[in-house]
């Protein structure tokens, strides 16, 4: 999972208007090699979320932006990151875009009838056979951590025919 490098006229247009554009290369992505990827999977998954929040705090500390003025976007597993950071540090974000987000981690990963669930167990862990994996997933699952508090605006999109992230 990563944002491929490349030129984007959309990004250039944002920068020309005074916006700052940053990409967070968090653990769990393959941008920095296999060890970096492994440091963000299964029982190390929280590193991904912490890294993302740390990047935002670093941008704030260096006066590139301020808390509440950062817009973020992620899709699928990146949408899961959006869900976690939304719950963990809502004060940092001005807006959150989550495309087909994987936010109901527990119900998805315990339903082995879903076509992709068994194949994802090596990446996330198997909560059916491993209580520690279940507890770890539950500790960050965005769906299971929504509380009554102030949240920034969020746009969520779903795919009617997405086999990885169901729309319900």
What are the residue ranges of the model-derived segments?
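Short, surface-exposed "cap/lid" segments of acyl-processing enzymes
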Residues: 1-9
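Active-site-proximal cap/loop segments of hydrolase catalytic domains
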Residues: 8-17, 23-168
């Amino acid at each position: 999972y990563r944002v491929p490098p490349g030129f984007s006229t959309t990004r250039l247009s944002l920068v020309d208007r005074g916006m700052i554009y940053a990409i967070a290369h968090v653990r769990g992505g393959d941008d920095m090699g296999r060890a970096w990827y492994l440091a963000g999977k299964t029982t190390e998954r929280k590193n991904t979320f912490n890294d993302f929040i740390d990047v935002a705090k670093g941008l704030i500390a260096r006066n590139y932006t301020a808390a509440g003025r950062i817009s973020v976007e992620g899709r699928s597993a990146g949408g899961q990151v959006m869900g976690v950071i939304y719950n963990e540090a809502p004060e940092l974000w001005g807006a959150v875009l989550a495309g087909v987000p994987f936010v109901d981690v527990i119900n998805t990963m315990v339903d082995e009838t879903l076509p992709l669930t068994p194949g994802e167990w090596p990446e996330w862990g198997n909560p059916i056979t491993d209580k520690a994996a279940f507890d770890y997933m539950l500790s960050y699952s965005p769906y299971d951590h929504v509380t009554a508090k102030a949240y920034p605006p969020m746009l969520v999109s779903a795919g009617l025919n997405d086999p990885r992230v169901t729309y319900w």
